[in-house]
Curated annotation (Swiss-Prot):
EC number: 3.2.1.26
SMART domains, per the entry: Glyco_32
Pfam family, one: Glyco_hydro_32N
InterPro entries documented for this protein: ConA-like_dom_sf (IPR013320), Glyco_hydro_32 (IPR001362), Glyco_hydro_32_AS (IPR018053), Glyco_hydro_32_C (IPR013189), Glyco_hydro_32_N (IPR013148), Glyco_hydro_beta-prop_sf (IPR023296)
UniProt cross-references to CDD domains, sorted A to Z: GH32_Inu-like
The name this protein goes by in its record: Putative invertase
Binding site for substrate: 15-18, 34, 75-76, 149-150, 202, 288
BP term (GO), one: sucrose catabolic process
Localization, UniProt: Cytoplasm; Nucleus
Keyword Nucleus set for record: yes
Family label: Belongs to the glycosyl hydrolase 32 family.
Length: 508
C-alpha cells in the first residue's frame, strides 16, 4: 500500500528539504527545492524543480542547479521574474540570441556553499524556466563569511529596485541589500539578535501583507531557527511585523511570533509574482532534529506543506487584549473535492470510518460552540478529535489526536506511538500551545480545519490564526481511517463535515 502523501509535494527519490525559488510565471507555479538526488540524507545539494497549474498537481522538470567543477553545493535561495530585463540577460545581444517573453524571464538567486565560505550567485533561463545558465561572473555577493546564505529577492516598487534579505546565520543578522540589475548589490541595513535565537537564523522571507478589514498593510519578516526552537528544541519559524521604508525594517513591537506551533514546519517561503497580489507560502514539513533518521519505506525522504495564503488580522490574544497576527489558510482545497460529492457530517461520541481510504487525503472541518457558563463550571474539560488506523480508537497505538480546552485555549496534538521498530530521542510525540476562543461573549467558539494525508496532518485553528503541522511515522502502512469526536457536555456543533480530496500524487 502507498504511504506517499496524496496532496503534499514529495521528491521522486532522494532527500528533500527547503523550498526554494517559488515564483509564478505565465500561468505556472514554479517550485524549486533543496534536493540530494543520490542519497537519503542531506548532502550533495541540488535544486530540484517542478511546475503546477493549480499548486497541487506537480510535474517534475530537469534539475535546475547542480554543483559545478568548484564542488560548491547549491544551497537555498529565491527566484524573480525580471520583466524589464534589468539584468540584461533577456534581450537579443550579449547574453541571449533572442528576446525572451517578459513573463518568462526567470532569474534564480542562490547560495553556493563551500567548506569555509558561502557566496550569493545567480542563474537565468532563456527557455521559460526549463534550463538555467549560471552567470559567468558569479558570485554577485561575497563578504568572506562562512555562514552567509539563503537570499530572498523581490522587486520593491516604491524604491524601483530589487531588495535582498539574506542571513549571517550564526551572527543572528538579517542583512538588507539593494540592486538595480540583480548583479551589483549595495548594503542597506541590518536586523537581528531578536526573537528566538537558537543556534542560527536561516531561510528569511520578507513580504507585504494586507490587514483584513482595513486598507492597511504591514511588512512581515519571516526567519527560521535551527536548532534551539522554543517549541521542540529543533526547528521552527518565527515572524516579526513592522514597516519598511525601502532601506530599514522597523518592527511595530518587540514580539516574536511563531508561524506554526507543530513540530514539522520549517524554511517557509512565499511565491514571487503571484497573481492578484496574493501571498502564498509553502514550508518544509520536517525537523532537522530527526529528519535524517525518520523511517523510509519508499525511495524518498521529505515533503512540503500544502500551499497557504497569508494575511494579517486582529484577534483576541486573551480576554483583555487584541493583537495583530498572521493568518494562514489552505489555498483552493475546494478544487480538490471529488466531483458531485457532498461532505459527510461529523458524528459525536462514536467511532466512524472515513468515506474513503488509501485513494485520497481528507479534510475535516467543524465549529464548536459552548456556553460561557458551562466553561466556567467545568474549566478542565477538553474537546478531543482522534484519528486512528483501527476502529479500537481508545487502545490503538497508531493514532493522531487533537485536544482543546475552552477555559484557557490550551491545545495539544499527540501523534501516537511512531513505531515499535523506530525510536529516536529527539522525536517528540506531543506538542502543546494555546489559542483563544474566537469569541468571549455568551458562547465560546472553536473553529477547526484539519487536512489529513498519508504521513502528515495540518491543523488550522480559528480560521488559521494558529497552525500545527506534524508528520507521523507508524509501523505499518495502514492509513488513518477512523475518527472519534468528543466534545464537552453542553457543547454543540455549529457546523461540521469531512470531504475526501482528489489524489494528486505525481509519482509512485
Amino acid at each position: 500500500m502507498p504511504v506517499r502523501p496524496c496532496i503534499h509535494f514529495t521528491p521522486p527519490e532522494g532527500f528533500m528539504n527547503d523550498p526554494n525559488g517559488l515564483v509564478y510565471s505565465n500561468g505556472k507555479w514554479h517550485l524549486f527545492f533543496q534536493w540530494n538526488p543520490t542519497g537519503n540524507q542531506a548532502g550533495n545539494q541540488h535544486w530540484g524543480h517542478a511546475v503546477s497549474k493549480n499548486l497541487y498537481k506537480w510535474k517534475l522538470l530537469p534539475t535546475a542547479l547542480a554543483p559545478g567543477d568548484d564542488h560548491g553545493l547549491m544551497f537555498s535561495g529565491s527566484a524573480v521574474i525580471d520583466k524589464t530585463n534589468s539584468s540584461g540577460f533577456f534581450e537579443s545581444g550579449f547574453f541571449s540570441r533572442k528576446s525572451v517573453d517578459p513573463e518568462e524571464r526567470i532569474v534564480l538567486i542562490y547560495t553556493t556553499h563551500y567548506d569555509n565560505r558561502e557566496t550569493q550567485n545567480i542563474a537565468y533561463s532563456l527557455d521559460g524556466g526549463i534550463t538555467f545558465i549560471k552567470y559567468k561572473k558569479n558570485p554577485i555577493l561575497d563578504i568572506k563569511e562562512s555562514q552567509f546564505r539563503d537570499p530572498k529577492v523581490f522587486w520593491h516598487e516604491e524604491s524601483r529596485a530589487w531588495i535582498m534579505v539574506v542571513v549571517l546565520a550564526q551572527k543572528y543578522k538579517v542583512l538588507f541589500y539593494h540592486s538595480l540589475n540583480l548583479r551589483d548589490w549595495v548594503k542597506l541595513s541590518e536586523f537581528g539578535s531578536a526573537g528566538v535565537l537558537g543556534y542560527q537564523y536561516e531561510c528569511p522571507d520578507f513580504v507585504r501583507l494586507p490587514i483584513e478589514g482595513t486598507d492597511e498593510f504591514r511588512w512581515v519578516l519571516i526567519v527560521s531557527i535551527n536548532p534551539g526552537s522554543s517549541i521542540n528544541g529543533g526547528s521552527m519559524v518565527q515572524y516579526f511585523i513592522g514597516d519598511f521604508d525601502g532601506q530599514t525594517f522597523t518592527p511595530i513591537d518587540s514580539a516574536s511570533r511563531i508561524l506554526d506551533c507543530g513540530h514539522d514546519c520549517y524554511a517557509t517561503q512565499t511565491f514571487g509574482n503571484a497573481p492578484d497580489g496574493r501571498v502564498i507560502s509553502i514550508s518544509w514539513a520536517s525537523n532537522w532534529n530527526y529528519t535524517n533518521d525518520v523511517p523510509m519505506r519508499m525511495k524518498h525522504r521529505g515533503m512540503f506543506t500544502i500551499p497557504r495564503e497569508l494575511t494579517l488580522c486582529y484577534t483576541h490574544l486573551n480576554q483583555e487584549t487584541r493583537g495583530l497576527v498572521l493568518r494562514q489558510r489552505p489555498v483552493n482545497l475546494h478544487h480538490l473535492y471529488y466531483p458531485d460529492s457532498l461532505p459527510a457530517p461529523l458524528l459525536l461520541n462514536r467511532v466512524c470510518e472515513f468515506p474513503t481510504v488509501w485513494t485520497s487525503a481528507t479534510v475535516f472541518y467543524l465549529a464548536v460552540s459552548i456556553p460561557k457558563s458551562i466553561v466556567l463550571e467545568s474549566p478542565m474539560e477538553f474537546l478531543c478529535l482522534t484519528w486512528s488506523t483501527t476502529p479500537d480508537v481508545e487502545t490503538s497505538k497508531e493514532y493522531f489526536e487533537l485536544g482543546y480546552r475552552f477555559h484557557d485555549g490550551a491545545v495539544y496534538v499527540e501523534r501516537g506511538v511512531c513505531s515499535s521498530s523506530w525510536k529516536y530521542p529527539l522525536y517528540p510525540e506531543r506538542c502543546t500551545s494555546s489559542v483563544p476562543p474566537s469569541s468571549y461573549e455568551d458562547n465560546y467558539i472553536l473553529e477547526i480545519e484539519a487536512v489529513v494525508d498519508h504521513s502528515i496532518i495540518e491543523v488550522y485553528l480559528q480560521g488559521g490564526i494558529m497552525c500545527l503541522t506534524n508528520a507521523y511515522y507508524f509501523k505499518g502502512d495502514e492509513p488513518l481511517q477512523y475518527y472519534y469526536l468528543r466534545v464537552p457536555t453542553g457543547a454543540s456543533l455549529a457546523k461540521s463535515g469531512m470531504q475526501p480530496l482528489l489524489n494528486n500524487r505525481p509519482h509512485s
